[in-house]
Curated annotation (Swiss-Prot):
GO terms for cellular component: plasma membrane. This is UDP-N-acetylglucosamine--N-acetylmuramyl-(pentapeptide) pyrophosphoryl-undecaprenol N-acetylglucosamine transferase. Keywords: Cell cycle, Cell division, Cell inner membrane, Cell membrane, Cell shape, Cell wall biogenesis/degradation, Glycosyltransferase, Membrane, Peptidoglycan synthesis, Transferase. It comes from Thiobacillus denitrificans (strain ATCC 25259 / T1). Pathway: Cell wall biogenesis; peptidoglycan biosynthesis. Its EC number is 2.4.1.227. It comes from the Bacteria. The gene is murG. It is an enzyme of class 2 (transferase). Belongs to the glycosyltransferase 28 family. MurG subfamily. UDP-N-acetyl-alpha-D-glucosamine binds at residues 15-17, 127, 175, 201, 255, 300.
């Protein structure tokens, strides 16, 4: 079958951790001549970024119920019936050659209907702990791919309602412009260390509050040069916080060119979302990882442990991190140590993840 006649249905929704890796694969397959359409909701991030990328959307009426009230849970059967019908209609109309599910509750009805109609189904799990949708769909999938090793087999992982799944560790698709700095470049730098602080697109209040106070405890000669992404809601407050601490810092509400930000920094302080961890590894950036304490199934701790256990990062839980402890850690950092950590990060990276997932989709279409 010619690539120009192949069609991919993507199912990923809700957050950037699901949407952006799926978008990377979708764009790669479009470059190879595939037609792509996307199953999503109007409430998720996909409603904004997927049409902007020129990909057709098929809307489904699906919402999560975890942490919701009783009424929402009682309405789940009716909501699923509607979403199943919408997904079934999309598959019958568009007749995709391969269906790619990359998490989020939106993927569940589409994945179930793809299996019912005997469409090749690929499931990719971005986190170190399998999400509910992917745990269910993994039992039906033709190929199960993971961003971290041993997902669905960890003792701490959630059970799956079938025999043990055979999963393949392919890594997390990241943007192609995120690559490691040339070997030895960071160790050869002189002057103050360069610190990048990132709390995600919305910022991280705990990091915004803690980092300025920690840097204020250091002698001025030991302070790194700081670029701090605050999140749009926190930019003014964070600038005031650095000013009150008498610490010079470049505060940005959002960093458009993360590839350049990674290349320019010596180390980072950030959360441990799946995309962040994958990007740090590909960019070879040592990091202090502070997992978001309220992440579903505490998956950010597992994500962070992947780098920390290999000596590529420090892992500190938010409840254990104080300004004093952070200042002590920063004071003990030197370029040789950072260079060694950077090498470890690069060894763990899977920079070809996007192409690998695309290759697997193509193989199933033959």
């Amino acid at each position: 079958m010619a690539a120009a006649n192949r069609t991919l249905m993507v199912m990923a929704g809700g957050t950037g951790g699901h949407v952006y890796p799926a978008l990377a694969v979708a764009e790669t397959l479009r470059e190879r001549g595939w037609s792509v359409f996307w199953l999503g909701t109007r409430a998720g991030l996909e409603a904004r970024v997927v049409p902007a990328a020129g990909i057709d959307m098929v809307w489904v009426s699906m919402g999560g119920v975890r942490g919701k009230g009783l009424v929402k849970k009682l309405l789940l059967p009716a909501m699923l019936l509607v979403a199943f019908a919408q997904s079934l209609g999309a598959i019958l109309r568009r007749r995709p050659d391969v269906v790619l599910g990359m998490g989020g509750y939106t993927a569940f009805p589409g994945g179930m209907m793809a299996s019912l109609l005997n469409r090749p189904l690929v499931v990719h799990e971005q986190n170190s702990v399998g999400g509910l949708t992917n745990r269910l769909l993994a039992c039906l999938a033709d190929r199960v791919l993971t961003a971290f090793p041993a997902v669905f087999t960890h003792a701490h992982d959630k059970p799956i309602p079938c025999r043990r799944v055979s999963a393949e560790w392919v890594g997390n698709p990241v943007r192609g412009d995120i690559t490691a700095a040339p070997a030895g470049e960071r160790a050869a730098r002189s002057g103050p260390l360069r610190l990048l602080v990132v709390g995600g697109s919305l910022g991280a209040s705990a990091l915004n509050e803690l980092v300025p106070r920690a840097l204020a405890l250091l002698p001025e000669a030991q302070r790194p040069r700081v670029v701090h992404q605050s999140g749009r809601r926190h930019v003014d407050a964070l600038r005031a916080g650095y000013a009150a601490a008498a610490v010079d810092a470049e505060v940005r509400d959002y960093i458009d060119d993360m590839a350049a930000a990674y290349r320019d920094c010596d180390f980072a302080i950030c959360r441990a979302g799946a995309m962040t961890v994958a990007e740090l590894a590909c960019a070879g950036v040592p990091a202090l990882l502070v997992p978001f304490p309220f992440a579903v199934d505490d998956h950010q701790t597992g994500n962070a442990a992947f780098l920390a256990e290999a000596g590529a990062a420090w892992l500190v839980q938010q409840k254990d991190l104080s300004a004093e402890a952070l200042a002590e850690l920063i004071a003990g950092i030197d370029r040789n140590r950072l260079a060694a950590m950077s090498e470890q990060a690069v060894r763990l990276a899977k920079p070809d993840a996007t192409g690998r997932v695309a290759d697997i989709c193509e193989a199933l279409a033959k």
